[in-house]
Amino acid sequence: MNSKFIVIEGLEGAGKTTARHIVVETLRSHGVKEVVFTREPGGTPLAEKLRELIKQGMTDEKVTDKAEVLMLYAARVQLVDNVIKPALANGQWVIGDRHDLSSQAYQGGGRGIDQQLLRSLRDTVLGDFRPDLTLYLDLPPAIGLQRARARGELDRIEQESLAFFERTRSRYQELAAEDDSILTIDASQSIEAVSADIQAALQQWLQQQGLLAVVQEPR
């Protein structure tokens, strides 16, 4: 089975949607036809309800940091078990807009939640299930927030302080440095430069995994 799970990560305004299009175009140019898209939190009826609570909060009750992270993992296990794993088993490639790395960075770095607790949650909920490749779009938070604000109204998390996003970015960078399956892309460059870097990184990874010839075969 040659299906793979590729995740795109980064702060608000990093360009994840654009990156997803580039990844899909690159894969399809090499013969990958079956692609499933996911987003976190969300992607199933229950996970989408949790997404709304996480993103918008509640008018009459504060969402605590631990409640937030537990909702994220509840949404994640629904998505993984009901969508991602079945798609992979069916031979489809899955492209995810965020996955567990977001929780490790946002909740572990930004919120300051105990990292051992987060690792324990990850291992309990996901077991040894991990993305095959993660593309981390690295961007100074000030630039990302400026881009996010230009898109319109900010959600509950996007309204956090610059310091929150600085901590989140630092944790992303730490985690990327520890894991060879996480490739860092400089997202502060022009769209053309970012696109070229993503294409090059993805093609090199396909080659290293011995997948380039396999995915090209149907063409």
From Swiss-Prot:
SUPFAM superfamilies: P-loop containing nucleoside triphosphate hydrolases. It is an enzyme of class 2 (transferase). Gene3D superfamilies: P-loop containing nucleotide triphosphate hydrolases. Its EC number is 2.7.4.9. Pfam families: Thymidylate_kin. The keyword Glycoprotein does not apply. One of its GO terms (molecular function) is dTMP kinase activity. GO terms for cellular component: cytosol. ATP binds at G10, L11, E12, G13, A14, G15, K16, T17. Keywords: ATP-binding, Kinase, Nucleotide biosynthesis, Nucleotide-binding, Transferase. It catalyses: dTMP + ATP = dTDP + ADP. The keyword Transferase applies. Disulfide bonds: none annotated. GO terms for biological process: dTDP biosynthetic process; dTTP biosynthetic process; dUDP biosynthetic process. Phosphorylation of dTMP to form dTDP in both de novo and salvage pathways of dTTP synthesis. Belongs to the thymidylate kinase family. This is Thymidylate kinase. The gene is tmk.
